[in-house]
Design a protein with these regions (language model features):
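Short cytosolic juxtamembrane segments of multi-pass membrane proteins
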Residues: 370-383
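A short amphipathic helical element positioned immediately N-terminal to and/or at the very start
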Residues: 3-12
Length: 383
């Protein structure tokens, strides 16, 4: 077997080509890990948002979009008096009538952005139990409460969404009264407004939905039967987890586009690496002949060349690891209904290492085999 140190020396003898191969491997591994992290983060964020005990009551025909839904006022009271399996807190049912509205928010300096605004009452904190008020308090009339990551979704500076700052919505100036979080969900990129205020600002008479928290998941059947029995109310019951699962399916093409872009760019980098390896190995044909002449067969030389290219792939992977850990880890990425946070898990890092190794093997095999095909006399006579 050719010594491992021989492979290292060959890489150091051609630092320019080695750096080119390492950079190409780094780019490919970085793209693959970023695509994997985006897919995982978006899917996990949407999955975390749904509570298995929560049911969303929406208008018939609006099961896939709460924003388009219309539910008559008073439905929450009707449901509370008709269904026995609703969780009670302080002798009150956990029912949250809500309006979900996509609208433009502006800062005082005129910067505007589209926000997902949720009109709620205090009971929303009972229903959405992941929500915690970090600073300040729940908004009173004329006030607004923002999620911890709302500034990322809106593209505003963090300082513009601090307590006491003013945001403008539909010509109304709203004072920020509190900041909340809901770790790992899309909720913490939302903006919450008192329900009655939002109905006034948007001139709406109906709700978007009613979110109900049940004592146990099997009580959903009673709630579903109620909506099917009361045809006059034109309601549909959908479990919150199922709603966000459908949203995740809706965003699946976007996640696939990330993979496709990573794949296409990786193919380009792979061909660039193949060209570099062909040039590098072709200039060493005489060296390969000399190694065969002293007793090493072609398979051992082939293995040594694959080890060389694999080393460049693994070094590129290590560089990519450094970039994701120091720069990309924890970055927030906005999308239409919120933000998700990139998280490079151990599985994703292992995928990156495997990609670098496979890239080295696949990239090194064709040029290595092509250079070892000539007979020993031909390689020794090669210029």
């Amino acid at each position: 077997m050719i010594p491992f140190s021989h492979c290292i020396r060959n890489l150091l003898r051609r630092p320019g080509q080695s750096c080119q191969l390492i950079a190409g491997s780094c780019v490919v591994v970085l793209l693959v890990m970023t695509a994997a992290s985006m897919n995982h983060a978006m899917k996990q964020t949407l999955g975390n948002t749904g509570d298995p005990l929560n049911t969303i009551i929406v208008g018939a025909g609006s099961e896939e979009s709460v924003e388009r839904s219309e539910v008559k006022q008073g439905v929450a009271e009707i449901i509370g008096s008709s269904i026995s399996g609703i969780r009670q807190i302080m002798d009150k049912p956990s029912l949250s009538p809500e309006i979900h509205f996509n609208g433009m928010l502006s800062t005082q300096d005129g910067k505007s952005s589209q926000a997902l605004i949720r009109g709620v009452q205090h009971v929303a904190l009972w229903v959405h139990q992941r929500v915690r008020i970090l600073e300040g308090r729940f908004p009173n009339p004329g006030e607004i409460m923002v999620g911890r990551l709302a500034h990322k979704k809106l593209g505003f500076n963090r300082s513009q969404l601090q307590i006491g700052q003013i945001l403008v919505f539909n010509g109304e100036e709203l004072i920020i009264s509190g900041i909340f979080d809901a770790i790992g969900t899309v909720l913490e990129a939302e903006v919450w407004v008192p329900l009655q205020d939002l109905m006034t600002y948007t001139q709406r008479e109906n709700l978007s939905c009613v979110v109900v928290t049940l004592d146990e998941a099997r009580s959903f059947g009673d709630l579903d039967a109620f909506t099917k029995r009361r045809l006059d109310l034109e309601l549909v019951a959908i479990q919150e987890t199922e709603y966000y699962t459908k949203l995740s399916t809706f965003y699946k093409p976007i996640r696939w586009m990330a993979w496709i872009c990573a794949f296409l760019l990786s193919i380009g980098a792979l061909f660039g690496g193949l060209n570099a390896l062909y040039a590098s190995f072709s200039s060493r044909i005489q060296e390969f002949g000399a190694i065969q002449a002293i007793g090493f067969n072609r398979w051992k030389i082939l293995f040594s060349l694959i080890v060389e290219s694999s080393i460049t792939g693994l070094i590129g992977s290590l560089l990519a690891f450094g970039i994701v850990v120091l720069i990309l880890q924890g970055i927030t990425v906005p999308f239409s209904i919120g933000v998700f946070v990139l998280n490079f898990t151990q599985i994703i890092l292992a995928l990156g290492a495997g990609t670098g190794l496979v890239l080295g093997v696949i990239g090194g095999l064709p040029p290595a085999w092509n250079c070892l095909r000539p007979s020993l006399p031909e390689t020794l006579r090669a210029a």
